[in-house]
């Protein structure tokens, strides 16, 4: 399968390199892709140095394994069957080179189609600001249409030094949070009950009520929430 060609910009922590010749993803080199940032912020705005040697519990990655994916850049250019991991802490897509290097792809990305055990999972950037989240925050798209159901992963990092131990312990926890994005072009924290959903979308309340009742859905269950929004978007 042929890869699309493009001129891309990539940067490392200490320097920025300009790719002057179109290349496929299969022959990138270290000068073309910068390393993933080591110092970053957790969900509380705390600086986290992932380069420090510590005993770690938990992971900032959506999946710790490299999985095949298609990447669509903000320019519309598409790359297929790339091995990646998604760093939910730094909001980066980490690309694995043929030489085994793990590097961050830093050009603006619009969408990632991640293949996990045959199931295609969609992730997108570019949503409005909500508290500490911005257009560079990555969301998993659970349902998309006139109303989109999004999942944001709040990452909390805690560090502690146990009594009489010389080793620092770092715990990385993921807290999924659901959001709705609609034609008002704003992010809304997803309601947790059927009643609150009907109150939020009063114009579609009759339609939503019918969907909820006919399918016996309770949106406090994520799978039911996904079905509800998907059916709303069908009409």
Q: What is each PLM-predicted segment?
A:
Residues 198-235:
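Long, compositionally biased interface segments
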Residues 18-58:
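Sec-dependent signal peptide cleavage junction
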Residues 28-33, 105-108, 114-115, 193:
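General structural signal for secondary-structure boundaries
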Residues 62-188:
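Aromatic-patch recognition
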Residues 1-26, 228:
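Bacterial Sec-dependent N-terminal signal peptides
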Residues 168-170, 181-187, 192-208:
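Extended, compositionally simple fibrous regions characteristic of intermediate-filament-like scaffolds
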């Amino acid at each position: 399968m042929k890869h699309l060609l493009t001129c891309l910009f990539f940067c490392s922590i200490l320097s920025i390199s300009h790719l002057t010749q179109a290349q496929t993803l299969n022959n990138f080199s270290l000068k073309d892709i910068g390393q993933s940032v080591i110092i970053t912020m957790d969900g509380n705005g705390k600086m986290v140095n992932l380069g420090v040697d510590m005993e770690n519990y938990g992971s900032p990655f959506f999946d710790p394994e490299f999985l095949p994916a298609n990447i669509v850049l903000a320019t519309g250019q598409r790359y297929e069957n790339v091995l990646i991991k998604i760093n939910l802490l730094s909001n980066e897509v980490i690309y694995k080179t043929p030489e085994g290097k793990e590097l961050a792809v830093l050009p603006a990305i619009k969408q990632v189609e991640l293949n996990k055990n045959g199931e295609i999972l969609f992730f997108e950037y570019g949503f409005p600001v909500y508290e500490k989240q911005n257009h560079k925050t990555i969301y998993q798209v659970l349902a998309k249409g006139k109303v989109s159901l999004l999942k944001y992963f709040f990452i909390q990092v805690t560090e502690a030094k146990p009594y009489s131990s010389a080793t620092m312990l770092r715990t990385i926890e993921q807290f999924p949070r659901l959001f709705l994005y609609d034609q008002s072009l704003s992010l809304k924290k997803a309601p947790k009950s059927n009643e609150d959903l009907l109150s939020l979308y009063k114009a579609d309340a009759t339609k939503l009520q019918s969907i909820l009742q006919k399918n016996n859905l309770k949106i406090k269950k994520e799978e039911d929430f996904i079905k509800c929004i998907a059916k709303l978007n069908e009409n």
